[in-house]
Regions:
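Structural/interface elements that position substrates and couple domains in central-metabolism enzymes
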Residues: 1-188
Length: 188
């Protein structure tokens, strides 16, 4: 019914941005004033809130199965800090929560994001402030134990990531959509 400006939304590592993570909860709050149930919206919010935890569980499983490396000793490359592809916006980004969880488990975490060269100050993640994006062209197979794709920017050389031959946890289906080898890729 809407032929122009359609933008499909697909599951990922959690919700981000200025409206979608917040506005449904306003609707829930307002609906309660009229004694209306919004349980479906609340359940969706709970699921979306816990997606970063689910992604970390999948990452831990992959590291255990493919590398025998504990998450507490793992070196993780987080691909994408922006909340959606091809923008420099980190508002409510699930990538910040992912990095916080991984660091909390003792993992060494670096990130690459061509749109976010440095992590800005964020109220909920002050410990991430000032971290800098690493240059992807300088990354070798010995530098990281796994790659976690949180934001699938279009200007990333995913074929080069495939050649690293290390586990990739793909929360955005970036490899399959580009027809790249899936041997080391796990969807999350």
């Amino acid at each position: 019914t809407k032929p122009y400006g359609f933008q499909a939304f697909y599951p990922g590592p959690g919700l981000g941005g200025h409206c979608i993570p917040i506005d449904p909860f306003y609707l829930t709050w307002k609906a309660k004033e009229y004694d209306m149930s919004t349980r479906f919206i609340e359940l969706a919010g709970e699921i979306n809130t816990h997606m970063p935890d689910h992604v970390v569980v999948r990452l831990r499983q992959v590291l255990d199965r493919k590398s025998g490396i504990a998450l507490s000793r793992a070196r993780i490359l987080l691909l994408g800090m922006a909340y959606k592809k091809n923008v420099p916006d980190m508002r409510e980004s699930p990538s910040a929560r992912l990095m916080q969880i991984l660091l909390g488990h003792g993992a060494a975490v670096a990130f690459h994001d061509p749109y976010v060269p440095t992590v800005p100050k964020m109220r909920d993640y002050p410990e991430l402030f000032g971290r800098n994006s690493v240059a992807l062209e300088n990354v070798g197979a010995d530098d990281f134990d796994a790659v976690l794709i949180a934001t699938d920017h279009d200007n990333i050389d995913y074929a080069a990531l495939a050649r690293l031959n290390i586990p990739v946890i793909d929360t955005r289906n970036a490899f399959a959509r580009r027809g790249l080898p899936m041997d080391n890729v796990t969807k999350a």
